[in-house]
Every structure is written in C-alpha cells, then in structure tokens.
Amino acid sequence: MEALRFAHTQSPHFHCRIFTPPTFNYTVKSSAADVRRTAPRASSISAAVSRAAAAAEKKPRPAASPELPLVSPSSLTSEPGCVLPKLPSHGENGSLGPSGIEYLTGILSSKVYDVAFESPLQLATNLSRKLGNNIWIKREDLQPQWKSVERLGATVVRVGDTYDEAQACAQKRAQEEGLTFVPPFDHPHVIMGQGTVGKEIMSQAKCCIDAIFVPVGGGGLIAGIAAYVKMVDPDVKIIGVEPNNANAMALSLHHGRRIMLDQVGGFADGVAVKVVGEETFRLCRDLIDGVVFVSRDAICASIRDMFEERRSILEPAGALALAGAEAYCKHYNQKDQNIVVIASGANMNFDRLGQVTDLS
C-alpha cells in the first residue's frame, strides 16, 4: 500500500497538522520525532475507570466477542518498520471487537435507551444478545448498518439532526420511563471495554510497538486504549486522529477544557461530535501524546489504498487512523517505526463510494 510506505514523496492531497497537548512532560531524545513520555501516575486514571478495568480483567470474554487479529503487514510496510492494521472486517457486522457495554449489562433494566455513535453496531449487537429485543437506539440518520441492528431485534428510533439532539432525547425518555441511559463513550465501563482493543494489540503484537493511531470522536476508544497501554508500556505513543472539521478533542486539549463546536463536518460521521465526553477528555488530557488532523481527501485516499491492498472497504471514520498515521510519518520522516492503526469501522454507505473515488 503506497500510502503507508514511509519513504516516499509527499502526496498533494495530504494536509496534516500535529497538535500536542501543552500540559505533557516530555523527555526528548535524539530528535523531535523521538518523543517518550514519562510513565503516567496511577492517580491520572480515575477510581471509576480503575474499578471498571479491574472488573474487566476478571470477567471472561463473552464467546460472541472473539479477538480480532492484527493483520500481517505484508506490503503495508517499508522495512525495517511496519504498519499493523486492526481491521473491523474480521469482526461481526464490520465493527471493531467487543464493547464496554458488555460490562454494563449486569446493571441494566430490561429496556435501554442508547445513543450509539462511535461504534453503533457493536453496541446494539452486544446489548441485543444480553437483553433480548427491548433495545432502543437513538440516531438521526439512515446508515446501512442500522438494517443489521433492526434484524437483531432492536427498535431503532431516529430523532434529531445531530448526535447531541439524539442524546438529549434519549436521556429525557430514559428519565421519564425510569430506564437506564447508556452513553456511547463517556462511561467508565464503556471506556475500559473499548480499552480491550489495546489489550488485544499488546498481547498480539510480535514486535515492539512504537505508536498506536486511534480515530477520535467522543474519545471513548482512545481513552480506553490509552488507559490500558500506558499502564503496560508508557513508551508507546497514543496518537489521536481527527478530521479537520471535527476536531473537538484537539481544541479541548489546547484550551484545557471541553470545547463545544458550533458545527461539525459529516463526512466521517462516525466521529462527528460537537463535544467530547467529560471522562474521556480528562483521560486523554493526561495520557495521550497528541492529535493529528487530516483532510477529507486524505481519508478517501486511505479508503482507496486499503481496498487496493486488502480488498477491505473502510468507512470514512474507519480510515481516519490510517490517514493520520501516514500524515504523521511523513511530517516526522519516520521510516523505522512499528505502527498500529485502529481501523474502527467498515460500514460504508454504498452511495458514498462515488464521492470517495472522486476525492482519492
């Protein structure tokens, strides 16, 4: 895959800005590209997340949620470095592995109002197995994965024009009917459930991992991965990737508080949130190493490249980390790094394929 070869000329369709949270303490070694963070203090992870992590360690993985393998690098690499994609196409219904929702099912009522966003299909799938047909998902748009959700027996209620409107409606209905509201990312169990992806990476990798690139929406996935990986190996960089026009996490880290965007771009709709979670922001502020911005053209190029290499079609949000890894490695002229990219979704809207082709 040419887009992932570290030693090639800059492509004109890439636009990259590297954002590093200003509150981090770094030890700079040989160059600006070789940055190693000091180990995070135990106090940097909240008690709630720590308790959830301990519970997750003790609780066996459900049989319905097998680990997704790291894909062998093959021609994705330029020796001596390599890129290891974590692909959703190996998982059920094109989503990435198990969800933290599995760790919440013991406290849920028989009916749940759930705003699923960062990985909507896996949330609904896992909940459907646990609780039967009494699942309600709030979301406003008509994406193809919702057909699979409905086939699982979930009732899909589409409301509002944005995720925030859908969440407000779900919270209101849950309060009125005495139900449990399940947030898609800002809950300790959800965060640590997402962190099982980090656990899989560290256990499956056959080489020393230098960096993990993670798509960022509300922040649950990257917060969970960072919470686990930084406790195991603080030298592994955790780098978030956001679209240029949906960069709520980077702006929040820059200002030291959560920032709500006036509007967000909808191309990578799986990460298009106006404001990140409170707990996810705090964890990202303490643990992650930076955020990369990429353009829509860069995302489309990564979708094309993954298809040409693996015959796997990623949705825009799923290709986000891939685009960010390339942009980062070009920016810092990285040629010998072992990189993991989280390809978080393969639920591509068929009608969007033409647009992706034109922009790639």
Regions found by a protein language model. Name each.
Residues 2-360:
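PLP-dependent amino-acid enzyme catalytic core
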